[in-house]
Amino acid sequence: MAAKIGEIVQVHNDNPVKRVPIARPSFGREGKQIKLLSNHFTVKLSGIDAVFYQYSVSIKSEDDKVIDGKGIGRKVMDKVLQTYSSELAGKEFAYDGEKCLFTVGPLPQNNFEFTVILEETSSRAAGGSLGHGSPNQGDKKRSKCTHLAKKIVVGISYAAKIPLKSVALALQGSESDHAQDALRVLDIVLRQQQAKRGCLLVRQSFFSDDFRNLVDLTGGVSGCRGLHSSFRTTIGGLSLNMDVSTTMIVTPGPVFDFLLTNQNVRDIRDIDWPRAKKMLKNLRVKAIHNNMEFKIIGLSDEPCSRQTFPMKVRNGSSEGETVEITVQEYFKSKQVDLTMPYLPCLDVGKPKRPNYVPIELCHMVSLQRYTKALSSQQRATLVEKSRQKPQERMRVVTDAVKNNRYDDDPILSSCGIKIEKQLTRVDGRVLSAPTLVVGNSEDCIPNRGRWNYNNKRLFEPVKIERWAIVNFSARCDMSRISRDLINCGRTKGIIIERPFTLVDEDSQSRRCTPVVRVESMFEKVKANLPGPPEFLLCVLPERKNCDLYGPWKKKNLHEMGIITQCIVPSVKMNDQYYTNVLLKINAKLGGMNSKLSLEHRHMIPIVNQTPTLILGMDVSHGSPGRADVPSIAAVVGSRCWPLISRYRASVRTQSPKVEMIDSLFKPLDDGKDDGIIRELLLDFYKTSQQRKPKQIIIFRDGVSESQFSQVLNVELNQIIKAYQYMDQGPIPKFTVIIAQKNHHTKLFQENTPDNVPPGTVVDSGIVHPRQYDFYMYAHAGPIGTSRPTHYHVLLDEIGFLPDDVQKLVLSLSYVYQRSTTAISVVAPICYAHLAAAQMGQFMKFEEFAETSSGSGGVPSSSGAVVPELPRLHADVCSSMFFC
């Protein structure tokens, strides 16, 4: 396939037909039957004639200023219901906490205006002051002027009708405009119930401050275990999906304890205060001397003993005079002796009106979400301590449904909604694992999703001749690593010559920046090698996620074109450890560890008969709280058809937090296409005997149901444009499959404590009433409760039978070259995720804000300039560098 020269051709109609997700054609039949339980609870819906009335809510102060402080809305609306129940005809309502209110049936009139007064004076809600006994500018005056001490004007106006009958129609498989809206109202009813109990609400999950739910993650952060609940339309009827959920919160307790653990110091005097200021900003604290809550905006410039503020002192009947007083003196006058006056104060006022309170008098408010990125150690602790065995999870969710007493809710009752208290039973099928082929064309049959290379050779081992080991670790025996790696490779069929050189980092370089350390190491490598190596083994320091990783990968893959494998010294550097390392090295250097038996014998249904390109697509976003970090879009494409085990990656940056990939087709001013798909199409053509793909199977990760239409009508259109620009022949047939891991459906075996066996597929009972979806457990779950991948087939022009789609998905979970286990999602998606993560290390994202206005960037869909990723060197761009 050759790129077309010249102007971009017209590639589609001006008004293309909008694609919609296809309906389920039929059900799968193959596999051994298995009885399962799901964490869905059947919902009986008898009041289908009920109609939800939606009303818009506005909350303003007397002077017409909008009040939108967090938590105010629910308090105000509770007061409205309490005060004006008769005007509202005694109707209960569901309120989303912001601008929408819902009732069953209409209110007496379409528009209301109510006035309420809240007697609470919480600074958290109103942005007020510390109140009596606290140093600030205009102390007494400000204590009387919080928003909540004033009258609040509430406007309620009719917005829309949402018939509950729409849910019944959706359950019958009909398209319904209001079904999702009605389900959202039902979810809001459950959220409101938990809000009244004081729970933290995070989307459709809720969390209480019961200490038994907390897991200390160190650093002042705790994992908080709660519950997720959502109503779902399924082929078996309406259901309530209830699952265990976890979020991160700031560990409640004294602020100085939080600072000590957050910065891992023992003495409060060792605190890095600029860092503390950044961490504390916008967190809420409660002052123990007056029991009021405040939001932190910063720290004082001076410690309590020296930080002054003006205070008006009255003398008899005169106006009095203003004097400067320190925070410490002020509190002493109020009979509060500070024990740590050398600490700065928390500023809980406003930017131009500071309001100081000593740190030692403040405690962190409970249930504050922690939205910053966790460290690798915190993540590991969270995963380890959040695990629940299947039987325990079943008990927790069942108890939750029983204890929440949903049947007593007046709104649910008025809709005729009754929720069963038992887990829903579903039928599943266990598909047979695909047979693999290893060295000497020997068959390897996985057992419960696992296999090994004991006494086996790799299917296509490479030979490594020109290589070296570089050592950034202070404690490492490179000679032993070299010897053990060579010996292990020999047993797996990989011939590894002795390394040309073993290069240690000198002690002086260890004090330099990561980039300088990498450059110095490369100078030493070049001085000790007669030519460029084909492979470098890099020993990193003991610490994971070390700062050297990104610069090292960029130097090798972008500048030098050298395949590299990084390892971290481990206590257990045994044969299994070296085998796992060699699996990655062999795949990166062009070898193949195993392949499917069907692939080896050219017997993969449909894919084998017609040139077929398989794409895996994913977008990785910056860590929480980093809205300035570009997202990274990665697409991998299969190569060397009819193989489905080899892939090449293409990666681009795009606007932060944007999920839709905008660089699949990327026409330039010179008439060329610099998009991702062109790169992968050319590679397929070159490696597949100059064949063009006549079928393209797309696996897309990371999109929600609300984005399905964009995948079908935006991303797919880009792919078609890229193909038509290169070739004006027939457009390939497409099959588009979404893979979702971020859902809350779990399945359990009924009579055993074990997880669901690998190969289990469910396409009945709890699946969509109309759309073409199924749940697949391709992997084994040895610990915790395993989660299935939820696959949605949005388009199938190729014409797979359901059994063929499900077997293809299962097979693609066994071609992941990095491991000897089946993985939970198809390998192309995992590879795309790995490619995005590794290429993301190429750039220092914290510098993006400074560089985005300079050269080398490309305009994003929002108009802002997003810096481009450095491209891979020509010598490695077609490799599986991401393994």
Curated annotation (Swiss-Prot):
Gene3D superfamilies: 3.40.50.2300, paz domain, Ribonuclease H-like superfamily/Ribonuclease H. The keyword Cell membrane does not apply. Residues 535-844 form the Piwi domain. GO terms for biological process: regulatory ncRNA-mediated gene silencing. It holds the Pfam family PAZ. One of its GO terms (cellular component) is nucleus. Residues 254-366 form the PAZ domain. Keywords: RNA-mediated gene silencing. Belongs to the argonaute family. Ago subfamily. Probably involved in the RNA silencing pathway. May bind to short RNAs such as microRNAs (miRNAs) or short interfering RNAs (siRNAs), and represses the translation of mRNAs which are complementary to them. This is Protein argonaute 16. It comes from Oryza sativa subsp. japonica.
